[in-house]
């Protein structure tokens, strides 16, 4: 069986390696686009926005509601009207987390972008650590690893095993040595992120963006972050079916896409 070549990127991606080696970015020049995919997070969305606003960087806050049904949409609109959200986009049907991120990314203008989940599992106080290698000119993308020693809530053993297996499988195909491919926290240069032509709708976003960054031969750093995972009773959405699907996504985006 012959697979399509992995070395046939789009014109936009093909141009990215030539952008490496830039001079450092002055912190005063930073505009951080914060991409917040939201689905039925009425209990936490105000709290996460408080944490986002507390980080002293110039930022563009973009929320995409993926057809919430618990009152989140109305709450988001009130916060937009109050000036707490810069851009608010509503999906007219539930399309998935990846689709919400892609919608937010298309609306972004910042020279660095980061995805921020709305569920309080990831702490915006870790942003400075994620941004430092990009501002120093050492990295094009920085992954925040939950397994490099940062404080974390102790929860599910099998989730950790599953994450290790998926990260290892992804590393085998990308030839990277990441410890946490599935992390939400990926700070990426804005020009890079917007050129990647992402297609995933659900939780395939993480394997896809990792594969595309690797294929473009960009500089990836990994730094430790804190993590406060939720239980399913508290609203955690990802399950074992998403883990199984991730295997297919890793194969697809490294061998076929």
Can you say where each PLM-predicted feature lies in the sequence?
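Short, well-formed alpha-helical segments that are part of the catalytic scaffolds
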Residues: 17-20, 41-54
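A conserved acidic beta->alpha catalytic loop
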Residues: 65-74, 120
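Acceptor/aglycone-binding surface of glycosyltransferases and processive sugar-polymer synthases
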Residues: 91-107, 112, 124-203, 229-240, ...
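Short beta-strand/loop segment that forms part of the nucleotide-sugar
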Residues: 49, 53, 58-68, 89-91
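Hydrophobic helical membrane-anchoring modules
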Residues: 1-31, 173-176, 198-257
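Conserved donor nucleotide-binding strand/loop of the catalytic core
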Residues: 59-62, 73-107
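Acidic helix N-cap motif at the loop->helix transition within catalytic regions
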Residues: 43-47, 70-79
């Amino acid at each position: 069986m012959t697979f399509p070549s992995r070395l046939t990127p789009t014109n936009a991606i093909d141009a990215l390696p030539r952008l490496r080696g830039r001079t450092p970015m002055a912190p005063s020049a930073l505009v951080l686009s914060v991409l917040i995919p939201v689905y039925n997070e009425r209990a936490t969305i105000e709290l996460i926005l408080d944490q986002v606003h507390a980080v002293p960087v110039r930022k563009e806050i973009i929320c995409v509601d993926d057809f919430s049904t618990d009152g989140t949409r109305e709450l988001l609109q009130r916060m937009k009207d109050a000036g707490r959200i810069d851009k608010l986009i509503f999906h007219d049907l539930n399309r998935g987390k990846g689709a919400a991120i892609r919608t937010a990314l298309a609306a972004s203008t910042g020279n660095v972008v980061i995805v921020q989940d709305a569920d309080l599992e990831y702490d915006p106080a870790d942003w400075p650590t994620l941004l430092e290698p990009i501002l120093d000119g050492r990295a094009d993308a920085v992954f925040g690893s939950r397994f490099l020693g940062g404080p974390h809530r102790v929860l599910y053993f099998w989730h950790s095993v599953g994450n290790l297996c998926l990260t290892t499988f992804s590393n085998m195909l990308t030839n990277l040595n990441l410890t946490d491919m599935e992390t939400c926290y990926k700070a990426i240069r804005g020009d890079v992120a917007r050129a990647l032509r992402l297609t995933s709708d659900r939780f395939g976003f993480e394997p896809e963006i990792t594969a595309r960054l690797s294929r473009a031969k960009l500089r990836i750093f990994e730094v430790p972050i804190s993590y406060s995972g939720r239980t399913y009773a508290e609203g955690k959405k990802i399950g074992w079916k998403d883990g199984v699907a991730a295997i297919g996504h890793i194969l697809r985006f490294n061998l076929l896409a």
